[in-house]
Amino acid sequence: MAPAPPPAASFSPSEVQRRLAAGACWVRRGARLYDLSSFVRHHPGGEQLLRARAGQDISADLDGPPHRHSANARRWLEQYYVGELRGEQQGSMENEAVALEETQKTDPAMEPRFKVVDWDKDLVDWQKPLLWQVGHLGEKYDEWVHQPVTRPIRLFHSDLIEGLSKTVWYSVPIIWVPLVLYLSWSYYRTFAQGNVRLFTSFTTEYALAVPKSMFPGLFMLGIFLWSLIEYLIHRFLFHMKPPSDSYYLIMLHFVMHGQHHKAPFDGSRLVFPPVPASLVIGVFYLCLQLILPEAVGGTVFAGGLLGYVLYDMTHYYLHFGSPHRGSYLYNLKAHHVKHHFAHQKSGFGISTKLWDYCFHTLIPEKPHLKTQ
């Protein structure tokens, strides 16, 4: 027989107040206490919105308005559970706790919302690399991978390969921006020589000259095309549903994108690591060189590469930044968080929602009484 779980810690109202005075952000749901101090800067509604509710019962906030939090958001909250509120019940705050606690006892439907995350009973062993385990999940993989957790992920046994599978955010601009600048300078000089022609592989008589004044337009075309590529890759490759009986396709999905949905705030896995990124970027470069004249294809590639850098930096900021309420990035952050926690089959645009509008995959705005 398995040993009984240890009793939950308990805190008096005065103990909670001392922690709040020290700067911690504790909230409660009924008598259950949660320490959100490490999460406040990630909150999609902004840090101040969450800190303003420190010490309060957030039950009404979870149910809306402005929106009803999803099952994943409630499950996420349970990972910050620290114990129970005890002691003399004073004022409306404590009376609400008693009332909600009684509701929990009589309403079985509320039980899953208060279920504590048990790492020892998860479908995988978090003490071991995950990549070799996820393929065995089969039909359970898709549901499991879309239930986000707060902890970091280890993929490989080898420290070397593990190190190559993650990176810091600033490696992206450090490595790729100098290449963008070099390619832009090099291909602009080629345009300036006046020897760039289109359709020379088909005809010399009707080949079209490409003046250097076209350089900015081609560069911007590359940025624009990247936004479409970003959308298509995210929607059709990253969000493919691997066959439940394919061990290796499940592994492939997890290493490409599933790991990010499982641990959305693992900062070392938010941007593409340089080594695998260089292989993909190299393929795009070769394709453009085969299709277009060198200077034209290279200029479009340079713009696309800058578009990729902007995408990765935007993606990182949407997870770890705190944009001003009502700003473009604030709305983009809210859109992306909904994609992670509730709408994994829509909202595929990261740096822009343009293509979600075009392909009708925009996350719908719903009244707060409906779960988002």
Curated annotation (Swiss-Prot):
FA2H is stereospecific for the production of (R)-2-hydroxy fatty acids. Plays an essential role in the synthesis of galactosphingolipids of the myelin sheath. Responsible for the synthesis of sphingolipids and glycosphingolipids involved in the formation of epidermal lamellar bodies critical for skin permeability barrier. Zn(2+) 1 binds at residues 234, 239, 257, 261, 339. The keyword Lipid metabolism applies. It is an enzyme of class 1 (oxidoreductase). Zn(2+) 2 binds at residues 260, 315, 319, 336, 340. PROSITE patterns: CYTOCHROME_B5_1, CYTOCHROME_B5_2. Pathway: Lipid metabolism; fatty acid metabolism; Sphingolipid metabolism; galactosylceramide biosynthesis. The chain crosses the membrane at residues 168-188, 213-233, 271-291, 292-312. Its cofactor is Zn(2+). It holds the Pfam family Cyt-b5. Heme binds at residues 43, 69. The keyword Iron-sulfur does not apply. It is found in: Endoplasmic reticulum membrane; Microsome membrane. Residues 219-361 form the Fatty acid hydroxylase domain. It comes from Macaca fascicularis. It catalyses: a 1,2-saturated fatty acid + 2 Fe(II)-[cytochrome b5] + O2 + 2 H(+) = a (R)-2-hydroxy fatty acid + 2 Fe(III)-[cytochrome b5] + H2O; hexadecanoate + 2 Fe(II)-[cytochrome b5] + O2 + 2 H(+) = (R)-2-hydroxyhexadecanoate + 2 Fe(III)-[cytochrome b5] + H2O; octadecanoate + 2 Fe(II)-[cytochrome b5] + O2 + 2 H(+) = (R)-2-hydroxyoctadecanoate + 2 Fe(III)-[cytochrome b5] + H2O; docosanoate + 2 Fe(II)-[cytochrome b5] + O2 + 2 H(+) = 2-hydroxydocosanoate + 2 Fe(III)-[cytochrome b5] + H2O. This is Fatty acid 2-hydroxylase. Its main location: endoplasmic reticulum. GO terms for molecular function: fatty acid 2-hydroxylase activity; free fatty acid 2-hydroxylase activity; heme binding; iron ion binding. Belongs to the sterol desaturase family. SCS7 subfamily. GO terms for cellular component: endoplasmic reticulum membrane; membrane. The lineage of its organism: Eukaryota, Metazoa, Chordata, Craniata, Vertebrata. GO terms for biological process: ceramide biosynthetic process; establishment of skin barrier; fatty acid biosynthetic process; galactosylceramide biosynthetic process; glucosylceramide biosynthetic process; plasma membrane raft organization.
